[in-house]
Amino acid sequence: MATIESGTTITSRLKNLLRSPSIKLRRHKAGTKKEDLSSKVTLEKVLGITVSAGRGLSCDPKTGLVAYPAGCVVVLLNPRKNKQQHILNSSRKTITALAFSPDGKFLVTGESGHMPAVRVWDVAERTQVAELQEHKYGVACVAFSPTSKYIVSVGYQHDMIVNVWSWKKNVVVAANKVSSKVTAVSFSEDSSYFVTAGNRHVKFWYLDEAKSSKVNSTIPLLGRSGLLGELRNNFFTDVACGKSKKSSSTFCITSSGLLCEFNDQRLLDKWVELRTTVANCILVNHDYIFCGCADGTVRIFNPNNLHFLSTMPKPHCLGVDIATVTEASRLFSSAADAKYPDTIAMTFDPTNQWLSCVYNDHSLYVWDVKDLKKVGKVYSSLYHSSCVWSIEIYPEIKDSNQACLPPNSFITCSSDSTIRLWNMETSNIHGTALHRNILSNDLMKIILIDDNTQALLDTEYNSAGLGDKADHQALDTKVGIRSVCVSPNGQHLASGDRTGTLRVHELQSMTELLKVEAHDSEILCLEYSKPDTGLNLLASASRDRLIHVLDASKDYSLQQTLDDHSSSITAVKFAANDGKVQMISCGADKSIYFRTADKVGDAAVHFTRTHHIVRKTTLYDMDVDPSLKYAAIGCQDRNIRIFNISSGKQKKLYKGSQSEDGTLIKVQTDPSGLYIATSCSDKNLSIFDFYSGECVATMFGHSEVVTGMKFTNDCKHLISVSGDSCVFIWRLSSEMTINMRQRLAEVRQRGKQVEMSATHKTQNARRETIAVMSTAPVMSSDSDKEGVEDGSDEDTAGSDKASSASSSFGRSNSYWEMARGTNTSSERSNCLSKMPRQRVRWSQPAGNIEMTVKSMLDLRQLDSFAPCDDIIGFQPSEGLGTEFVVADNSSIQAPFGPIGSRSRPRVIRLMSCEETMFKQDVETPEGKECTIFPEMEEDESLERCGGFEVKGLPLRSYHDNVCQEKHSPDSACSVDYSSRLSSPEHPNEDSESTEPLSVDANSSDLEEQVEAEDLEPNSPVMDGEIPQTPDQEKFLKQHFGNLSAGNIPGGPLLTSERNDFSSISSRFLAMAAPSKNQPVESLMFDSEFSPALFQPSMEHPALINRTESQPKSAITTDHDFTSPQKLNYFQRKRKHLQEYEHIGKGGPFSSVMQIRKTQSVHDLVNEGNKTTANGGIVKMRSQVQTAAEREEKAIRRRTLPSTLIKVENLASGTPHSKDGKLAKGRSYMNPTTSSMAKISRSMSVGENLNIEENQDASLSFDGKGNCEPEIGAIPSFVETEKNRQTAKETVIIKPHLQPVANCSSTKTFQTKNRAHLTLDIAKPLPDRPLLSFNKGKGALEMESPRSPASSCKVKSSFSEFTCRNDNQASGALEKTSPSEDYGCSKSKENDVKANSKPNVYQERVELFSDMLKPIHRGRASTIGHTPDHHSGLCPEVEPIRPRSPSLNAAPTHNSASSVSFEQCELIASELQDSLQKALSLYRSVTTADPSANMERCKIAGLLTETFGMVKRELDFLKEGNSSPGTAMTPQDETGSDFTAPNLHEEHGTRRLGDDKTLALLQQYSELLLQAVEKRMDKKL
C-alpha cells in the first residue's frame, strides 16, 4: 500500500529535493525542537463531546472502539475498559465528521474552516496517512466504501461538492455538484453506489469503476434522484443502505418523523410514522433499524417489513441530580413530566451488540441490545453542553475529615447554567458527602442554577433538522455561570453568572447560602483571600467596572465597593506581603491597581490605593505566584508582564505565545511557582519558565478559545477548559513534575525552619519570604541578560533587613538575577547537584534522574507510590441486588483500579525521562465492565405492532410523470453538473406538495439562484454546524474582544431585563454621597430585599435605624424598583405606598421636597402616559435627540452596559435628580482614576455630560415653596381653564428661555426648554385632560382648604384616559376594559383616603413620579441602557411609538401674562381638529356593518365613554366658575369618573349637552343590538 506522508504533496517533495543540505539541516533542527515542545505534555483524558449529528459518531466493527470528536481531537473510547486514546488534528480545525474503515484499521475525518481537508488516520499508530483538500468551507459527511478503496466526502451547502476519492492513490476519481444541503451519506453493501440525503434531497450516485480506472483525470459523477412522491418537500436528516437480504433497499428518516424505504428502483416504496416530533438519525444492521428521535426516544423496527419492535430505555432526565442516581431504579424510573435530551447520533458495535447513542445535552450512552426485552446500560458519561468558562481545583485540606470533596477534585462552570464537580480518581471518593453514581465515572455532582432545563441542551445543535438557527432569544434567557471560586478551607463555593448574580454554595450539604444581585453585568472574576492574609474576604469583579468586597466570616456582608476602573475588570487577586494584605486588579482600561487593606473601626476592612499602573495594551488576566511577591499579567500584545506587588513596578516582560498573532486570554502559575501556563486566542496552550520566560511546552486540541486552566495540586496535570464545551486533562512531563515537587518540598522545609526560629509574626512573614526567594539557583542565569522594565524602580519588599531602597536594590532582584542571590556558592552547588538542569536539557543520564526521584520520594511522595488498597472495579451498593443485574462480560482481570486510581506496584523501578513513568500510554486503569439492566418487569416500551401503520404507494403512482431512464440533473450527461429534480424549496412546508415534480428540462440559472436563496439561513435547512467565520473566531470576538465595550451578546439585553435598581452596583452608583471612600454598608439596606440577602435577620439593628432615618420619599422609591424576577413586587407596589403614606405625620412638605431637583415638566406630564389601569406601562419615545443625549449614548458605548439608575437621593438634604442624571456621587459618567490617568482623556466625558445636564435642567425649585401643584389637581376651575390653555401653548417648542411660574413664595423662576427634545403623544383627543398647575399666589390662597379628593380626581382621570387615548390612536388592539378601569379607580380612591395627612402631596409626588418615570429615552439615565423594554413590568401592554407631532412638549408653569391670543387661537384650532378626527373615527366605526368585527363595537364604546368624560370635564369647569370654592368629598368622587348621572343628581342641575349625550348613547345601543341580531341570525 502506498501511503502518503502527512501534509506532503508532489510540489513539496520536489522542493525538498532541490533544497541545499544546510537548509534542510536547519529546518530539521527547528522542527525537532518544536516537536520536543509539543511532546512534553500529553493529552490524557477528554471530558467532553462535540458531536453535532449522526455523521460525528462511528464504531470500529472489529474492536468496538467508539470514535467521536471533541474539538480538534478524535477520542477513541473503549467502553468496556473505560479507556481513551486520542488523535489530535494538527491543522487545529474543528472535526465535523468521521467514519471507520470496514476493517477498523483506518479512520477518515472531515473538518470545518477555510480550505478544510479530509484526512485518513492510522488507528493503531494514531498518525495521519493521507489528506485531501478539495473542499472550500467545510466537510459535512464522510464515508468509506465497503471495500475500503474509496472515500466519499460531501461539502457544506455553500460548497456543494461531492468527491469520490481513491485515498491510497491520493486521486479524486469522480466529482459532481449537488444543489441541496446534504447531511448524510451511506454506501451500498456492494459498493456500486452511495446515497446522499438532505433538504428535499435523496440522491443515488453510481460508481463506474471500469471507467474511472481507465481515466486518470476526475470524471463527472453520475447521480439520479430518488422518487419521493408526496414526501418530496421533506427534510431527510439521515440515510442508511440495507444489509444482507435488504441490501437493495435504502432507508431514510425525515425531520418530521417518518421512516421511509426506497426500493432498488429508487422509488419510495413505503413509510411508517415514528410518533415523535423530530427524527434525527438512523442506523441499519442485519436485524434492526434504529431510529433516534426527540425526547431520548430510540425506536426499533424490523428492516424486512418496517414493523415496530421496541422502544429503547431513555437516558437520564434533564435536571436530574446525578449524585442521587446510585441505583438502577433511579435511572430507569421516569416521572410523568420528565424531559429528556434528543438522540442525535448512533453507532453500532456488531461484535458486542452494543448501540452507542449521543444526546443533545452532550451525553454518551452505550446500550447492550442483545435482547430487546432486556436492554442494559454498559457505559455512560455526561459533559457540559455549552462553553465552559472557568475551572477551580479543590484545595488540599490537611484534615481529610473536613474535606467536602475527595482529593484530585475540580469544579467547572458553563453557559449551560450548571456547576459541575469532577474527580479524576473516582475510586477514592468514599468518605465524602458525594458517593459514586451510575451515570458517570468522572462527574460527581451537577449544581443546576435554575429550573430552566432547556439551558442543558446544546443550542448550536438544531434538533429539528430545519434551517432556522438556534433561537437567540432562548440563548439570552439562560443565566450562564461565568466564574467560580472555592474558599481556601474548601467549605464554600462562590459563583457569578452573566447577569451579575452572586451565589455561594456550601459544599458539604450543597445548599445555597447566598444569592444576591451584586452587579449590573456579568461577573468576570471571583477571588477569596488567602489564609496568609488572616482575612476571609471575597472579591467580586464585573464587567460593570466595580469590585465588591464581602466578608465571608460575617455572612458575606458588604465591606466596600471600589470603582477605580473605567472599564471591565478582568482579574482581581489578594496577596499578603510584608505583613500587609493587598489587593491587585487589572482590567480592559489598561490599568493595574494595587491596594492595601486597612482596619476601620473594630473589624471593618477598607482598601486604599497605593499604586496605579497604566500600560498601552488591554490586560486580560492575572495570577499571583505562590510566593505572593509577583503578579503575572497576560496582555493583549501576547506579552506576560511581571510586577512586584509591594512596589507596583514592572519587573520583567516576555512573550507569552509562540504564535505571531492572537491575544493572551489566561495565565496561570503552578503550585510551586516555577512555571506559568498561558492560553492564546489562537486556541493554543503554552507553558513557560516563570523566571526566564523560556517556552518549555506547547499544547493544542481545543477548537475554541481556552477560557481557563489550572495546575493540579499533585503537579501531575494541567486541566484546561474551553468554549468548545470540553475539559482537557493534560499530563505533564516527568521532568516538570519532578521539578515542581522538588521546589515545593524546599519551600515547605524552609518555611518550617523559619517558623521554628521566628519570634514575631511579622518577622516570620519576612523571613519566610526570604526563604522562598533564596532558592534562586533553580532559575536560569539567562535572566541576567534580559532587560527588565522599570528595574531601577524596584523596591525593597521581601528584604530581611529594613534598609533603604538603594542599599537593598540588588537583594530584591535576587529572584530574577541569580548572581545577586543571598545563597553562597557552596549552597548553590549543593542545590544544583540535587536537581536536574532546566530547559533544553531534557535528555539526561538516567543516574541523575534516579537520584532526583529518590530525593523526591524521601521528602514527601512515598505515600503516592504506595499500593492501592481500593476496591477494583465497580462495586454495587448494598441495595442494588434486587434492583439490577451486574453482568461481567470481561474475561481479563484488570491489574489496575478504575479510572484515575494511579495504583502502582510495591517495587518501583526508577526510570529516565525517556521511559514511561508518566507516559500517556499508561492509560486509565481498566475496570470491570458492568451492564446495568432495569428491573424484570413487563416492558412498557413493547407496543403493539399495529400501532405503527406501514404506508405504501400504489404500484403505478409514478407511471405518468416519471421516466426512469431519464438522466438525473446531476448525472454525467449534465455538463455543468447542475441539479434539477429538486423543486425550489418552500419554507415551512414539509409534507404538502407545492408544485409538480419536473424532469423534462435542466434548471435555468434563475432557478438555481432561487434555489440557492432558499437555502439561506431563514429557510428550513439545518445549518447549526456551519461556522459563522472560517475558524469560528466569533466566540473570541463576542466574549473577549470587546471587554471595554458594552455590546456583547447577552450583556445589555440581559441587563435590561433586570430591574434597574436591584443590584448592589446600581445602588452604589446611584448614591449621591460626594466622597468615593464613603462606607457603603448602607447599600445593604436601601431596598426591602437586600437585608435578607446579606444579613441573617430582617430585624438587624442597622436595618431598623437606617429605615427610620430614611426620608419617606426615598423609601417609597426603593419599593418601586424591585427585581423583575419577583413580579409580585410590582403588584404590591401600591400597597407599600399606601402604608408609607399612612406613616407620614410631619409638616405639609418635607425638606426633601423643598430641595428636590425636579425633572422637567415633560417628565411629570408624561408619567401619566405610562400607567395603565392594571399597572401596565406604556412607553413613549423621544423622536429627536439632543446633543447631550448623543454624547451620553456615545459615552455608554465606551463604558460598560448597566442598568438604568432611577433612584431618589439616599441622603436627605443632598440635591439630586430624580432620574439619576445629576446624581454625581456614583455615576458611569463620572471620571474614574483610570480615565483621568490617561492623556487621551484629559477631561472626563462624564464630567462634561454632567455639566451639560445640569445646565439643561428644565425646572428647578428654590426649596421654599409648596410642591403641591405637581399632583396635577384642579382646585379652582377658573385656574384650571387657564392652566389648560397654558399647557396647550407649550405644544410649540421654542428654543429660547421662557419664564415659568413656580409654586414657591418667589412665584417665578427661569427655566430653559431643551431645543428639539420632543415627546409626541399619539393622536390626543380634543380636550384630553392634562396636568394643570397653579401659577399665582392668589390661586394658592383660594385653594388652600381643598380636600385630598379633589386633588386625586383629575390625576385618576388623567392616568386612565391618557393610556386609553394613546392606545386608541396608535391602533393598539389591547384595550382597557371598564372593569379594569373601575379597579384602577378603586385603588386610587384608596390612595385618596389614605392621604388625609398634611404631607400627602409630598408622597404623592413620589408615587406619581417614580411610577411613571421611564418616559424619556435620552434623559432617563446616565447608564447605557434605554427603558424601552422592561420585561416583567407590563407584558400585556405593547410599547406605543409616538406618532403625532402636535404635542412636542409637556405643559410648564407658564405665567398668565405669557399667554397670547395667537397661542389661544392655535390651541383652539388644534382642539377643533382633534375633535373632528375623533368624531370621524366614531362615525366610521358606527356606520359600518357592526357584525363584521366586534372590535369596532369596542372602539365605539371607548369613544362614547371618552366623549362623556370630556363633557363631564366641561361641566365641571362651568360649575367651578360659578362656585370656585366648592370641593368634592371622597364620597362624591366614588364613581364620578364613570357615572355622570350621579353627579347630575347630586348637584341638582341638568348640565348642558346631556340630551345629545343620551341620544348618542341611544344610537350606539341600537347599533349594538342590530349587530347582535345579525350575528344570531347568521348562526341560526
From Swiss-Prot:
Would you say which domain of life the source belongs to? Eukaryota
Which residues lie in Low complexity bias regions? 799-811
BP term (GO), one: positive regulation of JNK cascade
WD repeat ranges per the UniProt record = 90-131, 134-175, 177-215, 273-311, 338-377, 383-432, 476-515, 518-560, 564-605, 614-653, 659-698, 701-740
Give the signal peptide range.
none
Which SUPFAM superfamilies does this one have? WD40 repeat-like
Is Nucleotide-binding one of the keywords?
Answer: no
SMART domains on file: WD40
Q: Where is this region: Disordered?
A: 749-811, 820-839, 968-1026, 1211-1232, 1369-1397, 1519-1555
Which portions of the chain have biased composition (kind: Acidic residues)?
Answer: 1005-1016
Q: Where is this chain compositionally biased, Basic and acidic residues type?
A: 1543-1555
Xref: InterPro entries: MABP1 (IPR055292), WD40/YVTN_repeat-like_dom_sf (IPR015943), WD40_MABP1-WDR62_1st (IPR056161), WD40_MABP1-WDR62_2nd (IPR056162), WD40_repeat_dom_sf (IPR036322), WD40_rpt (IPR001680)
Assigned GO CC terms:
cytoplasm; mitotic spindle
Bias regions of kind Polar residues — which residues? 821-832, 994-1004, 1520-1539
Sorted UniProt keywords: Repeat, WD repeat
Q: What does this protein do?
A: Involved in JNK signaling pathway.
Record protein name field:
Mitogen-activated protein kinase-binding protein 1
Q: What is the lineage of its organism?
A: Eukaryota, Metazoa, Chordata, Craniata, Vertebrata
Q: Please state the gene responsible for encoding this protein.
A: mapkbp1
